[in-house]
Amino acid sequence: MYTSEEKCNQRTQKRKIYNVCPRKGKKIFIHMHEIIQIDGHIYQCLECKQNFCENLALIMCERTHTGEKPYKCDMCEKTFVQSSDLTSHQRIHNYEKPYKCSKCEKSFWHHLALSGHQRTHAGKKFYTCDICGKNFGQSSDLLVHQRSHTGEKPYLCSECDKCFSRSTNLIRHRRTHTGEKPFKCLECEKAFSGKSDLISHQRTHTGERPYKCNKCEKSYRHRSAFIVHKRVHTGEKPYKCGACEKCFGQKSDLIVHQRVHTGEKPYKCLECMRSFTRSANLIRHQATHTHTFKCLEYEKSFNCSSDLIVHQRIHMEEKPHQWSACESGFLLGMDFVAQQKMRTQTEELHYKYTVCDKSFHQSSALLQHQTVHIGEKPFVCNVSEKGLELSPPHASEASQMS
């Protein structure tokens, strides 16, 4: 017989032992694995012949063989072997992070995640990616990171068959099907499907711009916009086209460019069934179907009220934009601004393209310039049927390419 103290010491040691299942070869961590018989109470697993001193430990072992996971999450239907695993998982949905780091005040769902994070303060990162050499404090973080190299997306949406590399991304995606928006803004009552979207939105009320560039002192509300901006200074273009090896600073620019090679035109007009490579081109085209603004003098129609106002100035010979230096007048405000900039020889160029660092006075000039890089020719001449990168002088007689 063992004294209570001896039994306690034996159990403490046994908690630290990992056991390998002889049938499946899996490493399993079982509390109080039986090595020495205690009080004659032995529970043996019929599958792998392992012995245990507690019935609960035997049940856990048997579930590794049967695959049974009786604890189910009501939010995402994920299942677990132990109730404690379910409890930890549910914190993801509730955004509950009870484990806080004393060094930097970061908080975590699970105590193991906190332990992994604390290694970063100690300078210890034990898990290294074999492909790119990045280090991680937790094996789970390394596993998720490796999916960026392998392209593995193990989390499947049962509604639309979309796949995701993270379970949290799947949870958020499912809300697009259910319409659930659990995160509500207290200022304007706008609701969002993700907490990060709510946090970003709240900055429109507070004016907070936490992401600041140390090169030019520009600041941003969103981290993603900040990352894209930094590439202006570094010249980094991480997104490469596999067909022509052109590189881009933004993934969205690469996606649009690739349509030049594939011929894909995902934006379709429901009126005439014409298709377009860009959503902006579709919106501009759709306006041609609804000529709602008419000139009473010539019965000419326009897509925008601003175009009608400019047209009417021709009849009235009105030039509302006056230049004080020489009393020149302009029909269009944009012509006046352009002339003003030219005469003052200002170097203010507000619209900058990150691919080649060229800058422009007007957003329309920037949009036209972008077509040079992606190889798109959105305008077609009705006379020669040639594709053009820029709108031809006889733009009224030219229609956009589908």
From Swiss-Prot:
UniProt-listed Pfam families: zf-C2H2
Coiled-coil residue windows: none
Protein name as catalogued: Zinc finger protein 322
Note: Significantly enhances POU5F1/OCT4-SOX2-KLF4-MYC (OSKM) mediated reprogramming of mouse embryonic fibroblasts into induced pluripotent stem cells, and can also substitute for SOX2 in this process.
Spans through the membrane: none
Transcription regulation as UniProt keyword: yes
Main localisation: cytoplasm
ZnF (C2H2-type) residues: 43-65, 71-93, 99-121, 127-149, 155-177, 183-205, 211-233, 239-261, 267-289, 293-315, 351-373
Modification Phosphoserine occurs at: 391
Organism encoding this protein: Homo sapiens (Human)
UniProt tissue specificity: Ubiquitous. Highly expressed in heart and skeletal muscle.
